[in-house]
């Protein structure tokens, strides 16, 4: 907070998400609110990198998912890339954004360490490659089909690879539309709702515990906005 107040751009890492709790009070009461409480005099422009998710034998100390807590802090932006190219593009956008940004990075996607995540490793984009915050990516797009069961999967991070691999294994690539959120806040609601209205069904895939989760909140939002277009309840 102090570094940002004097014009610097701090980039901080919490290693790992399980260790974010001691700093949560400062993130909630100072980082996210400083601009508002000072009437714009002391905006906090910073990046907080957080390796996250289950991988290897980390057990209770290196495997948590904390997005359900972080997304309830107003005043910060949150990104969760699914591959190396997106990480670069989103990090550059975060650097130029005047707001505090939390970047959640799944440990299992570093160097594609988990089987089935080869596409997480990508050729480094150009120096000026930037992805706008708040814009989702339709990774696997399908056309509207009247006589075939279709589905929208909304996901991010590791879930993108689970969804893509599963649709291939089930030979349903032309029936399943996959949306990679990229940014959890601000949320690209327009892309989500457009897809769900087209397919009539939706599955929200995340790694986090389901109770009182980001996934349940998103499912409720989709259900509320797309109710008349849905053929079945939104599942998580």
Place the predicted regions along the sequence by residue:
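Acidic, glycine-rich active-site loops and adjacent beta-strand->loop/helix elements
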Residues: 14-30, 50-55, 84, 107-109, ...
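Short acidic, glycine/serine/threonine-rich loops at helix termini
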Residues: 1, 22-25, 57-63, 89-92, ...
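General beta-strand structural signal in soluble alpha/beta enzymes
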Residues: 12, 48-50, 78-82, 102-105, ...
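Thiamine diphosphate
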Residues: 1-47, 107-108, 112-236
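Conserved thiamine diphosphate
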Residues: 37-97
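Helix-enriched interaction subdomains in cytosolic or periplasmic regions
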Residues: 75-78, 85-125
């Amino acid at each position: 907070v102090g570094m940002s107040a004097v014009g610097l751009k701090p980039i901080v890492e919490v290693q790992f998400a399980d260790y974010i709790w001691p700093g949560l009070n400062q993130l909630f009461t100072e980082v996210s609110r400083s601009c508002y409480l000072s009437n714009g005099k002391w905006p906090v422009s910073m990046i907080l990198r957080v390796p996250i998710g289950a991988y290897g034998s980390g057990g209770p100390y290196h495997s948590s998912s904390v997005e359900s807590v972080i997304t309830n802090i107003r005043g910060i932006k949150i990104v969760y890339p699914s591959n190396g190219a997106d990480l670069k593009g989103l990090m550059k956008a975060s650097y130029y954004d005047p707001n505090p940004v939390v970047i959640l990075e799944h440990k299992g996607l570093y160097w594609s360490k988990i089987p089935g995540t080869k596409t997480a490793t990508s050729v480094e984009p150009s120096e000026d490659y930037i992805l706008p915050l708040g814009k989702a990516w339709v990774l696997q797009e399908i056309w509207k089909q009247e006589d075939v069961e279709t589905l929208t999967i909304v996901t991010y991070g590791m879930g993108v690879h689970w969804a893509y691999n599963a649709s291939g294994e089930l030979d349903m690539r032309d029936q399943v539309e996959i949306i990679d959120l990229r940014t959890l806040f601000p949320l690209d609601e327009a892309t989500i709702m457009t897809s769900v209205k087209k397919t009539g069904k939706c599955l929200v895939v995340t790694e986090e515990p389901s109770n009182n989760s980001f996934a349940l909140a998103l499912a409720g939002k989709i259900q509320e906005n797309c109710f008349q277009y849905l053929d079945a309840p939104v599942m998580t």
